[in-house]
Amino acid sequence: MHALGRTPALTLLIFIYNFVSVYTIVSVQMGTKARLCCRSIPLTKAVLITWIIKPRGQPSCIMAYKVETKETNETCLGRNITWASTPDHIPDLQISAVALQHEGNYLCEITTPEGNFHKVYDLQVLVPPEVTYFLGENRTAVCEAMAGKPAAQISWTPDGDCVTKSESHSNGTVTVRSTCHWEQNNVSAVSCIVSHSTGNQSLSIELSRGTTSTTPSLLTILYVKMVLLGIILLKVGFAFFQKRNVTRT
């Protein structure tokens, strides 16, 4: 491949890019493939095809193809962004495994003698949350959707007395935790429903019957005391019989 020389045209393209306001929003799940297409313009009319990639929080880069000389200029090396095919056949852009760092805006500009044609994408990366749960005390259950993007929504069946909190992370993901309590003793099982753009999950949770009280603790203490008393009696009895045997001899 040959490289196109850097020209002030790149600065002009980025300037135009910043003022383009019509976006096509594309949501892609992390780890899957993304393919972005240019405008449907016959390549026989194209003079220059340029992709301007502007990831959020990262420097911009370009992928350009000059039709007449078949020269390319690519400054996106190491970002897992490539042509979907050879640009002289299909000038689509491809990301083989989408990651959070690919989120941002992508502009395809096709330059023709009749003018320039643009298509802009706002690539949004979806991250499925890791869903877990655990039982708390006194007929309480906790359901957690960790590191999802966007934030997951948690609901319960049947309804209980619930408190939901969210924690945002530096990479844009969000952890949502819902803690729910049920007073009714007749509720023995509940369901935690986690709703997310990548798919919904439902977890069935068995609750302990009855509310937690001091009775089990008292029974435990009584049981421990009885065991200790039994051990003491055994030791006393063993010492008594041992002493008796010594006296006989």
UniProtKB/Swiss-Prot annotation:
Residues 25-220 are extracellular. Residues 113-208 form the Ig-like C2-type domain. One of its GO terms (cellular component) is external side of plasma membrane. Expressed in bone marrow, spleen, brain, lung, testis and thymus. The keyword Transmembrane helix applies. One of its GO terms (biological process) is regulation of neuroinflammatory response. GO terms for molecular function: signaling receptor activity. It is a single-pass type I membrane protein. It comes from the Eukaryota. Disulfide bonds join C38-C108, C143-C192. The chain crosses the membrane at residues 221-241. Residues 1-24 form the signal peptide. Glycans are attached at N73, N138, N171. Keywords: Disulfide bond, Glycoprotein, Immunoglobulin domain, Membrane, Receptor, Repeat, Signal, Transmembrane, Transmembrane helix. Its main location: membrane. Residues 25-124 form the Ig-like V-type domain. Residues 242-249 are cytoplasmic. Coiled coil: none annotated. It is found in: Membrane. Belongs to the CD200R family. According to PubMed:15187158 it is a receptor for the CD200 cell surface glycoprotein. According to PubMed:16081818 it is not a receptor for the CD200/OX2 cell surface glycoprotein. Involved in the recruitment or surface expression of the TYROBP receptor. This is Cell surface glycoprotein CD200 receptor 2. It comes from Mus musculus (Mouse).
